[in-house]
Amino acid sequence: MSKGTGVEIPVYQPEKNITRAEFFAMVARWMDLDLTQYANVELPFVDAASIPDWALNEVKAMYSLGILKGGANESGLTVNALATISRAEAMTILGRTQAKGYAEPELTFSDAGQVPDWAAGYLRSLVGQGVITGNDNRIRPNDLLTRGEVAKLLYAML
């Protein structure tokens, strides 16, 4: 079991929206990666200096494995480590950790039309695996994700 990160005081705070750095760290640790293998990886992100030290090797690992790709803006490729993460972004990253070949059922949630094209395949795969079940026939792809929701997702993926 890994020690929690991202909160100055040792409190879980499940209702708090999770930052991208916290999410990357949780997923990398859930994957049980040997982070020492990635210490020398060069990151292409123009905002790499904003990645907290406690999450740097996790971000390097996730980038090296093709799980984290970043986003582009006028300055170049960014990781936005300190920003919060949307449910669609998180589900895309979680989907990239999975083997291929899972069923990809049609999304029948009432807000399925709000799922970005780049996230749809990953989301369908997670629905097919039973990881994503929705709530009140909604998946809220553009809402932010809380620390508690991430813990529940990672537990469902065990």
Question: At which residue positions do the language-model features occur?
Answer:
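Hydrophobic core segments within long, regular secondary-structure runs in both alpha-
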Residues: 59-60, 120-124
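Feature responds to low-complexity, polar/acidic, surface-exposed segments characteristic
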Residues: 2-24, 28-56, 68-88, 96-120, ...
